[in-house]
Amino acid sequence: NVCDGDACPDGVCRSGCTCDFNVAQRKDTCFYPQ
């Protein structure tokens, strides 16, 4: 998805994606819920 992996320091992602903590990258990133 277009927003997968986006940084979201403000907690906001583009449409359809959710901001959550990425353990591997140790930062908040956007992901598209499966």
Curated annotation (Swiss-Prot):
Organism: Polystira albida (White giant-turris)
Keywords: Amidation, Disulfide bond, Secreted, Toxin
Domain of life of the native organism: Eukaryota
UniProt note: domains: The cysteine framework is IX (C-C-C-C-C-C).
Phylogenetic lineage: Eukaryota, Metazoa, Spiralia, Lophotrochozoa, Mollusca
Residues recorded as bearing Glutamine amide in the entry: Q34
Gene Ontology MF terms: toxin activity
Name the record gives this protein: Turripeptide Pal9a
Keyword Nucleotide-binding set for record: no
SS bond partners: C3-C17, C8-C19, C13-C30
Tissue spec. comment: Expressed by the venom duct.
Primary location class: secreted
Localization in the cell: Secreted
A GO cellular component entry from the record: extracellular region
